[in-house]
C-alpha cells in the first residue's frame, strides 16, 4: 500500500499535471518486481523536461539534428542542448543486422536503442574525461577553460512502436535502459510504415495510436521514470487509413459518390485484372481510370453538394441548411458516419449515394483525406497521453504551423509542440528568403514549437564534408587535408585536432599511473607521442587557395 501511495503522489506532481492515465497506481505496482532499479536515463529525462518547459516559458526552442556517432555528439554538445537519434539514419547507416536500407522501420527493433546506448556511453565517457582534465587544472585554469555539458538529453525515434502493445512496451524498456531521455511514436501502421516524406503512408485509427501511447507511458511508470513522450501524427499528408473503427476518423474518410459504380468495388476490379493476366502499368491504368470515375469525397463534401443541388427550395433556405450542416459537421464535433447521415436526412438529403467501402485498396485500406485539420483532431486526441505533439508536414509552412498550433492549443493551451526541419524539404524552393529561413525556428518557437530538429542533419553534414574533402584530396593530396581539415580545426577550436587527447589517452594514462603509484613507463601520452607537435608555436603567413577564392592565414598558431 505504501508503494501504491508513493506512485499516486508521483502522478500528482507538477510533472504529470496534464497527463491522463486509464489505469491505476495499483496496476503499475502490480507489474513491478521486488528489486527496485534506477536508471541514468531518468535523470536525463528530468533534465529534458526542465529544458523544454523553460523554452516554452521563454517562447524559444531547443534546436538539434540527428547525430550519427560520438564525434558528432561531442561537437554538438558545445552548441546545442539536445541530441536527436534518427531511425532514418540508423536504417541507412547502422542497423544491428548491418543491412542498410531506406526508412521503412524494417530493421531489427533494437537498432535505434543500440545507437542511443552508443551515443549515451560516449556522452558519459567524455563527461568523465573532462572532469579528470579539469581536476588537474588550477582554479585559475579552470576559470579560463570553458566547461562543456556533454550530457545533453537524447530524444530517439520509436517509429510506430514496432508492433502490438507488448512490442511497444519492450521497445520502451530498451530505450530507458539504453539512455533515452525521450522518444517519439507515430500514428502510421507498423506493417506499412514509411518515412514521413514518402508516399503510401497508412494511418492507424486514433484509438489504436492512443493505445500505443498508453502502453509507452505504462512501461515508463512501471520503471519509475519520467521519459518524455512525443506523439507524432502523419495525418497532414497521409492518404490511407487502416480502419474506420474510430468515429473521430470518419470525417476524413473518402467515399465514392458516383452511383454508376454501385456494386463495383476497386478491389474486385483489381483482382479481376490480375486474374486476366494484367500487371504493372496495366493494373495502374485500371486503378487510375476507376478512381477518375469515382468522384471521391468526404461525407461532408457529398452532403454539401447534395444540398446545393436541391432545386425545390429557395436560396435563403439553402443557405440555412448549409449553415446548419456546417455547424453539425465542424471538425471539433468529430461527426460519425451514422450521425451525419441522420442529420443529412433531416435536411432533406435522402438516398445519398456515398460508399467508403468501394474505393478500399487491395490491402483493405480506406481512402483518407489528409490535412492540417486531420492532424489537429489527432493532436488533440493524443495530447492527454503525450508530453509533446509533432505534426509531420510536406513543406516548411508557417501558415500550417500556425493552424496546427492554434488548433491543438485551443483545447490544450499548455501543450508543447515539436517540428521536423526536414532536409527532405527543398528549402530553396519554399519561397522563403534567406532572412525568412534564418527566422523560421524562432518564429514558430513563439507558436509553441519548443523542440525543433533536422532529422538527418548528421548524415547530410557527414556526406558533404566527406565528398568535398575526398575530391580535393584526390587532386591535391596532403595540402587538401591541411587546408580543409587541420587548419580549419585549429581556426575553429575543434578539439579533434589533438585526436589522441580527444579520444581520452590522457584519461587512461591517469588509470595507469594511479594503478602503478603515479608513474607509468607505458603511458600513451608520454615522451614520443606525435601529438606533442601540436604544442609547438610557430607562425605562418600567406594566402591559401580553397576551391573558389582564397583565405589568408595570418599568424596561424599550432
Curated annotation (Swiss-Prot):
Residues engaged in binding substrate: 86-88, 196-197, 232, 420-424, 455
Cofactor(s) this protein cannot do without: Mg(2+)
Listed CDD domains: ICL_PEPM
Enzyme Commission (EC) number: 4.1.3.1
InterPro entries: ICL/PEPM, Isocitrate_lyase, Isocitrate_lyase_ph_CS, Pyrv/PenolPyrv_kinase-like_dom, Pyrv_kinase-like_dom_sf
GO CC annotation terms, alphabetical: glyoxysome
One BP annotation, GO: tricarboxylic acid cycle
Top-level class of the enzyme under EC nomenclature: lyase
Catalysed transformations (reactions): D-threo-isocitrate = glyoxylate + succinate
Pathway(s): Carbohydrate metabolism; glyoxylate cycle; (S)-malate from isocitrate: step 1/2
Residues engaged in binding Mg(2+): 157
A Gene Ontology molecular function term of the record: isocitrate lyase activity
Keyword annotations of the record: Glyoxylate bypass, Glyoxysome, Lyase, Magnesium, Metal-binding, Peroxisome, Tricarboxylic acid cycle
Pfam families linked to this entry: ICL
Microbody targeting signal (motif): residue ranges: 556-558
Catalytic site: 195 (proton acceptor)
Subcellular location: Glyoxysome
PANTHER family associated with the record: BIFUNCTIONAL GLYOXYLATE CYCLE PROTEIN (PTHR21631:SF3), ISOCITRATE LYASE/MALATE SYNTHASE (PTHR21631)
Family stated for the protein in its record: Belongs to the isocitrate lyase/PEP mutase superfamily. Isocitrate lyase family.
Role of this protein: Involved in storage lipid mobilization during the growth of higher plant seedling.
Subunit (UniProt): Homotetramer.
Protein name per the record: Isocitrate lyase 1
Organism: Glycine max (Soybean)
Gene this protein is translated from: ICL1
Amino acid at each position: 500500500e505504501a508503494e501504491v501511495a508513493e506512485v499516486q503522489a508521483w502522478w500528482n506532481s507538477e510533472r504529470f499535471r496534464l497527463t491522463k492515465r486509464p489505469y491505476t497506481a495499483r496496476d503499475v505496482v502490480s507489474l513491478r518486481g521486488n528489486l527496485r532499479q534506477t536508471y541514468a536515463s531518468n535523470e536525463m529525462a528530468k533534465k529534458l523536461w526542465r529544458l523544454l518547459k523553460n523554452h516554452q516559458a521563454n517562447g524559444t526552442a531547443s534546436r538539434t539534428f540527428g547525430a550519427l556517432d560520438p564525434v558528432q555528439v561531442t561537437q554538438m554538445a558545445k552548441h546545442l542542448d539536445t541530441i536527436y537519434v534518427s531511425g532514418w539514419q540508423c536504417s541507412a547507416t547502422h542497423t544491428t543486422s548491418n543491412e542498410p536500407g531506406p526508412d521503412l522501420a524494417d530493421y531489427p527493433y533494437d537498432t535505434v536503442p543500440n545507437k542511443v546506448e552508443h551515443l549515451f556511453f560516449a556522452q558519459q565517457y567524455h563527461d568523465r574525461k573532462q572532469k579528470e582534465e579539469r581536476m588537474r587544472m588550477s582554479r585559475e585554469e579552470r576559470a579560463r577553460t570553458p566547461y562543456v555539458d556533454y550530457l545533453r538529453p537524447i530524444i530517439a525515434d520509436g517509429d510506430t512502436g514496432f508492433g502490438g502493445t507488448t512490442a511497444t512496451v519492450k521497445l520502451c524498456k530498451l530505450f530507458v535502459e539504453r539512455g533515452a531521455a525521450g522518444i517519439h511514436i507515430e500514428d502510421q501502421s507498423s506493417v506499412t510504415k514509411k518515412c514521413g516524406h514518402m508516399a503510401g503512408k497508412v494511418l492507424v485509427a486514433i484509438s489504436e495510436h492512443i493505445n500505443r501511447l498508453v502502453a509507452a507511458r505504462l512501461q515508463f511508470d512501471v520503471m519509475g521514470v519520467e521519459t518524455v513522450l512525443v506523439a507524432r501524427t502523419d495525418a497532414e499528408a497521409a492518404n490511407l487509413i487502416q480502419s474506420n473503427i474510430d468515429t473521430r476518423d470518419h470525417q476524413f474518410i473518402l467515399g465514392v459518390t458516383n452511383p454508376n459504380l454501385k456494386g463495383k468495388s476497386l478491389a474486385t476490379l483489381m483482382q479481376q485484372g490480375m486474374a486476366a493476366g494484367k500487371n504493372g502499368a496495366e493494373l495502374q491504368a485500371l486503378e487510375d481510370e476507376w478512381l477518375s470515375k469515382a468522384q471521391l469525397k468526404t461525407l461532408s463534401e457529398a452532403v454539401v453538394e447534395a444540398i446545393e443541388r436541391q432545386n425545390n427550395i429557395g436560396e435563403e433556405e439553402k443557405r440555412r441548411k448549409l449553415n446548419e450542416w456546417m455547424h453539425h459537421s465542424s471538425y471539433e464535433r468529430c461527426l460519425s458516419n451514422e450521425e451525419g447521415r441522420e442529420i443529412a436526412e433531416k435536411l432533406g438529403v435522402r438516398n445519398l449515394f456515398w460508399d467508403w467501402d468501394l474505393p478500399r485498396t487491395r490491402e483493405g485500406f480506406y481512402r483518407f483525406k489528409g490535412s492540417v485539420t486531420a492532424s489537429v483532431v489527432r493532436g488533440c486526441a493524443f495530447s492527454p497521453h503525450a508530453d509533446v505533439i509533432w505534426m509531420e508536414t510536406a513543406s516548411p509552412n508557417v501558415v500550417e504551423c500556425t493552424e496546427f498550433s492554434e488548433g491543438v492549443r485551443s483545447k490544450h493551451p499548455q501543450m508543447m509542440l515539436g517540428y521536423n526541419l526536414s532536409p527532405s524539404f527543398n528549402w530553396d524552393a519554399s519561397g522563403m528568403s534567406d532572412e525568412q529561413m534564418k527566422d523560421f525556428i524562432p518564429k514558430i518557437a513563439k507558436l509553441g514549437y519548443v523542440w525543433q530538429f533536422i532529422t538527418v542533419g548528421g548524415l547530410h553534414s557527414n556526406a558533404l564534408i566527406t565528398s568535398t574533402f575526398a575530391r580535393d584530396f584526390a587532386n591535391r593530396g596532403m595540402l587538401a587535408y591541411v587546408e580543409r581539415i587541420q587548419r580549419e580545426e585549429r581556426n575553429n577550436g575543434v578539439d579533434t585536432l589533438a585526436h589522441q587527447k580527444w579520444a581520452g589517452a590522457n584519461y587512461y594514462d591517469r588509470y595507469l599511473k594511479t594503478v602503478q603509484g603515479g608513474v607509468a613507463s607505458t603511458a600513451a601520452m608520454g615522451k614520443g607521442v606525435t601529438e606533442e607537435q601540436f604544442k609547438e608555436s610557430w607562425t605562418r603567413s600567406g594566402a591559401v587557395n580553397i576551391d573558389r577564392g582564397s583565405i589568408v592565414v595570418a599568424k596561424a598558431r599550432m
